């Protein structure tokens, strides 16, 4: 009886730590997933010798992300995407289906009017449109996925609250 009670107390003490670890891993996974999609879009742009973009669109309280290629040589544009001139090359995925309780912001979360859509484009020579995507987990962990336009390089950063600094993790 004593052993069962002790095991119950120990289990109750470790569950919150496990939950925090799961949420942090989920948020980190979401950041790495987006970094991977961005790197893949860049490689597709180079391979196709055409602009390729990831399109982010608000879908309720989450975002979808889809990949489009330039179909007429003028870059990937929302108007061309809607009429099929710029073809869909990877169907839209709801981020909340893959990473529940992870919140994506297309602009700095402190902005008073957050962005609800964005195109992150990559050119055939590997350059990109610069942007930072912000992710926040249910445990408060924060990650950023940053693309440097001149090189198309994608980096994943984690916010360390104790030092108030973003630290590169990938």
Stretch-by-stretch model annotation:
Residues 1-2, 9, 13-39, 43, ...:
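N-terminal helix-rich module
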């Amino acid at each position: 009886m004593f052993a069962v009670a002790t095991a119950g107390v120990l289990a109750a003490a470790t569950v919150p730590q496990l939950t925090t670890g799961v949420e942090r891993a989920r948020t980190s996974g979401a950041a790495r997933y987006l970094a991977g999609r961005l790197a893949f879009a860049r490689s597709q742009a180079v391979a196709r010798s055409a602009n390729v973009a990831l399109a982010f669109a608000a879908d309720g309280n989450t975002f979808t992300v889809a990949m489009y290629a330039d179909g007429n040589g003028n870059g990937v544009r929302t108007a061309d995407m809607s009429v099929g001139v710029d073809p869909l090359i990877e169907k839209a995925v709801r981020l909340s289906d893959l990473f529940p309780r992870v919140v994506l912001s297309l602009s700095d979360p402190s902005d008073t009017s957050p962005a609800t859509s964005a195109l992150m484009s990559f050119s055939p020579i590997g350059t990109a449109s610069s942007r930072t995507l912000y992710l926040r987990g249910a445990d408060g962990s924060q990650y950023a996925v940053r693309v440097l336009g001149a090189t198309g390089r994608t980096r994943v950063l984690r916010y360390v609250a104790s030092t108030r600094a973003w630290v590169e993790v990938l």
